[in-house]
């Protein structure tokens, strides 16, 4: 059973979709080697650690502004263009 419970975590991020996105993105960062913001002495799985981080208020989310979305899209487009150029 996941501790903390989903209901406890939903008190911090009240939208299930945002919660899943936030936890999964943080879990991927933990898998990639980032240090946890909460104690992980028992070597729990990354999703459990990320869930505890959200429940403790160490991790949260925010929606991007329109300007930030445009910047991210432009950056992504530039990366794709560079990747295509390197493959040719």
UniProtKB/Swiss-Prot annotation:
Catalytic reactions of this protein: RNA(n) + a ribonucleoside 5'-triphosphate = RNA(n+1) + diphosphate
GO biological process, one term: DNA-templated transcription
Pfam families xrefs: RNA_pol_Rpb6
Keyword terms: DNA-directed RNA polymerase, Nucleotidyltransferase, Transcription, Transferase
Gene Ontology CC annotation, any one: DNA-directed RNA polymerase complex
InterPro entries membership: DNA-dir_RNA_pol_omega, Pol_omega/Rpo6/RPB6, RPB6/omega-like_sf
EC numbers for this chain: 2.7.7.6
Broadest EC class assigned to this enzyme: transferase
Family: Belongs to the RNA polymerase subunit omega family.
Summary of the function given for this chain in its UniProt record: Promotes RNA polymerase assembly. Latches the N- and C-terminal regions of the beta' subunit thereby facilitating its interaction with the beta and alpha subunits.
Protein name (Swiss-Prot/TrEMBL): DNA-directed RNA polymerase subunit omega
Gene name linked to the record: rpoZ
